[in-house]
Amino acid sequence: MPRSNRNDNFIDKSFTVMADLIVKLLPINARAKEAYVYYRDGLSAQNDGDYAEALENYEESLKLEENPIDRGETLKNMAIIYMSNGEEDRALATYQKALDENPKQPSCLKNMGLIFEKRGRTAEEEGRRDDADGWFDQAAEVWTQAVRLNPGGYLDIENWLKSTGRSNVDVYF
């Protein structure tokens, strides 16, 4: 039974019914519809904290989905799971795949920067200043791209870029 048929929450059930109706009415092929069902079930599992099931559904969705924007969104969600599980290298690789599919995903860049910045802080705490600077520079690089894609959307990142002297003036205009 698809996960979408097991929702206990009234709002989730209502959303699922509406989404199913919209998908049935849209002029898209059966493969894309099936990919969406897997994606939706993956999202539901992810929201419930069932990451293994979410990843299984996302993998199935990727096998069927041809639209690069939708593939990018699916990959981004997978990367979020890897990141929350502490699989930083896998998360970074998956965020990059998501950006390869759809380069206009500032949240992927933001999250990549979070990993780089965390690694920089760890290196700094361990007294590895050169390594820390390298990680911070990588964070600045991806965060600058994120801010360019979403000006004003990441004020905390803009402040970090300014306070660390890693900002580019053109980012903010």
Swiss-Prot record:
SMART domains: TPR
Main location: membrane
InterPro entries named in the record: PSI_Ycf3_assembly (IPR022818), TPR-like_helical_dom_sf (IPR011990), TPR_rpt (IPR019734), Ycf3/AcsC/BcsC/TPR_MFPF (IPR051685)
Keywords: Membrane, Photosynthesis, Repeat, Thylakoid, TPR repeat
Name assigned to this protein: Photosystem I assembly protein Ycf3
Membrane topology: Peripheral membrane protein
One Pfam family named in its UniProt record: TPR_19
Family designation: Belongs to the Ycf3 family.
An individual GO BP term: photosynthesis
TPR repeat residue numbers: 35-68, 72-105, 120-153
Cellular component per GO, a single term: plasma membrane-derived thylakoid membrane
Function: Essential for the assembly of the photosystem I (PSI) complex. May act as a chaperone-like factor to guide the assembly of the PSI subunits.
NCBIfam families noted in UniProt: PRK02603.1 (NF002725)
Protein's cellular compartments: Cellular thylakoid membrane
